[in-house]
Swiss-Prot record:
The keyword Ligase does not apply. This is Flagellar assembly factor FliW. Keywords: Bacterial flagellum biogenesis, Chaperone, Cytoplasm, Translation regulation. It comes from Azoarcus sp. (strain BH72). It is found in: Cytoplasm. Acts as an anti-CsrA protein, binds CsrA and prevents it from repressing translation of its target genes, one of which is flagellin. Binds to flagellin and participates in the assembly of the flagellum.
Length: 146
């Protein structure tokens, strides 16, 4: 299938690369199918989660461990069933990240990560969800040391 990305332009993606988010993402419930896009030859740990349903919807994501963060949270039985997980090892956890400001590198302008609503993806089953953690909000800003 052919997708349009405002970041990478037109791209051909096989159907077996599509990740289904049955409930969509909060605020983007109409977007239920996504693909992970990565610039060829790039060694960055940030991927683009591009909606197949709406070309204007895309999120930069990375693994929390790439930011030096390790954390745990529990999934409900319903969430495990939605993902089709047989074991925790099948789950990939990612966080949505965004740059502060308009110019400069993420390290110099600040990189914000949403740790209170991680994405959980069953890589083999190609199903995902966004787990909203209902506790005090937390925003972590990473800045380059002077």
């Amino acid at each position: 299938m052919k997708i349009e990305s405002p970041v990478f332009g037109s791209a051909e993606v096989s159907d077996d690369k599509v990740i289904e988010f049955p409930a969509g993402l909060p605020g983007f419930e109409h977007c239920k199918r996504f693909v992970l896009v990565h610039e060829e030859g790039s060694d960055t740990a940030v991927f683009l989660l591009q909606s197949v349903d709406d070309a204007d919807v895309a999120f930069s994501i990375t693994g929390p461990e790439q930011l030096g963060i390790n954390y745990e949270f529990a999934l409900s039985d319903e969430e495990v069933a939605t993902l089709g997980l047989a074991s925790p090892a099948e789950a990939l956890v990612a966080v949505i990240v965004r740059k502060d400001g308009e110019a400069g590198s993420p390290a110099s302008t600040g990189l914000r990560a949403n740790f209170m609503a991680p994405l959980v993806i069953n890589v083999e089953g190609r199903r995902g969800l966004q787990k909203v953690i209902n506790r005090l909000g937390c925003d972590i800003v990473l800045r380059e040391r002077a």
